[in-house]
Regions:
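Alpha-helical DNA-contacting segments of helix-turn-helix folds
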Residues: 68-75, 83, 137, 141
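Short hydrophobic clusters on alpha-helical segments that form packing/core surfaces
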Residues: 25-33, 75, 79, 106, ...
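Helix-turn-helix
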Residues: 20, 24, 28, 32-66, ...
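N-terminal intrinsically disordered/low-complexity leader segments
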Residues: 1-20, 184, 211
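Membrane-embedded alpha-helical bundles of multi-pass transporters/translocases
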Residues: 22, 54-56, 72, 80, ...
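Hydrophobic/aromatic-rich alpha-helical bundle segments in the mid-to-C-terminal region
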Residues: 131, 135, 150-203
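Hydrophobic alpha-helical connector segments
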Residues: 70, 84-112, 164-168
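Hydrophobic alpha-helical bundle segments that form small-molecule/ligand-binding pockets
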Residues: 86, 92, 112-114, 118, ...
């Protein structure tokens, strides 16, 4: 029996006003999630928290699974934009600083300024994400890594695509697995998570310098 089609957003905001509305919806979604969990998230509650009519919310999200789907994509797009801004575009940093930024952005789940995505959201991801969506995210991240290293004109010899894909898989896969298992310390002050990110930075640097 084929799987039921997953809910997804009805449309993407293109105008400034609609982008503002959708961002407000996501902000309300996160506030309700933090206060009441997934069970507390309803389209009516999100509309009330946002201060919009339920019908306006339905213009974008037919149900709360579609809202979760849109929010997950929002998290990915925010991360990709941050990688572009901090690790790909700058021309006044050396390769070591560029790589540190790239690894930290890829690994760190607690970076200020990026939308929150936690263990509980990961546990619900299967409701809205298919294998093709995971592959799309990986391909987008791989493109950023390749572009970031292409900008490392002072790193010679340049690492091979196979090396970069292996390092990305370790960094991104490790990030997601740590969200899944929640190692002791990650749920408290995050010190273990910060230590892991530093170890990943050191591992990537060691691999690049060992060639």
């Amino acid at each position: 029996m084929p799987a039921a089609p997953r809910s997804k957003p009805l449309k993407r905001p293109t105008q400034a006003r609609s982008k503002f509305t959708v961002q407000a919806i996501y902000d309300a979604f996160v506030r309700i999630w933090n206060a009441h969990g997934w069970e507390g998230v309803t389209t009516r509650a999100v509309a009330l928290e946002t201060g919009i009519a339920v019908g306006t919310l339905y213009d974008y999200f037919p149900d709360k699974e579609a809202l979760l789907s849109g929010y997950v994509r929002h998290c990915i797009e925010a991360l990709l934009a941050r990688i572009d801004t901090e690790a790909v575009v700058p021309t006044d940093i050396d390769w070591r600083e560029r790589v540190r930024r790239l690894v930290r952005l890829t690994c760190d789940t607690r970076l200020e300024g990026l939308p929150a995505f936690d263990h509980e959201m990961l546990m619900l991801e299967h409701r809205v994400a298919e294998p093709k969506h995971h592959r799309r995210v990986y391909d987008e991240l791989a493109e950023r890594w390749l572009r970031a290293f292409a900008a490392c004109t002072d790193l010679r010899p340049a690492p091979s695509p196979a090396t970069l894909h292996a390092l990305l898989t370790a960094a991104w896969g490790g990030r997601r697995y740590r969200l899944l298992v929640q190692p002791e310390g990650d749920k408290d002050d995050g010190s273990n998570s910060s230590s892991w990110v530093r170890e990943m930075e050191a591992m990537v640097m060691a691999r690049l310098q060992a060639r």
